[in-house]
């Protein structure tokens, strides 16, 4: 279960609750949840190509998607209102920055 909000909560049966706090209040806009679902879908598809995706992994991927979503919104907003198209456009650069930082 993924509950999107200022802090996004993700939990799987028997697993710990994961909380992503990277969101900006500007994500309370039409289509933002769809963008988050798309990011999560891409992560799940990428991992499914390697092996099975169990509920615990799905929860971790949900939390990772929420972090990417929130950071992309911060990148796109520059502190002000943002559209979902701006958030989506910022996703590749956000993922690249996260990969460089690891």
Language-model segment annotations:
Residues 1-102:
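Small-residue (G/A/S/T)-rich helix-start motifs and N-terminal tracts that mark the onset
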């Amino acid at each position: 279960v993924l509950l999107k909000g200022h802090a996004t909560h993700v939990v799987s049966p028997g697993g710990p609750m994961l909380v992503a706090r990277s969101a900006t209040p500007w994500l309370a806009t039409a289509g933002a949840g769809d963008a988050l679902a798309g990011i999560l879908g891409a992560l799940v598809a990428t991992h499914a190509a390697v092996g099975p995706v169990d509920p615990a992994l799905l929860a971790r991927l949900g939390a990772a998607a929420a972090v990417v979503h929130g950071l992309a919104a911060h990148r796109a907003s520059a502190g002000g209102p943002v559209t979902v198209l701006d958030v989506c456009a910022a996703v590749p650069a956000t993922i690249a920055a996260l990969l460089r930082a690891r």
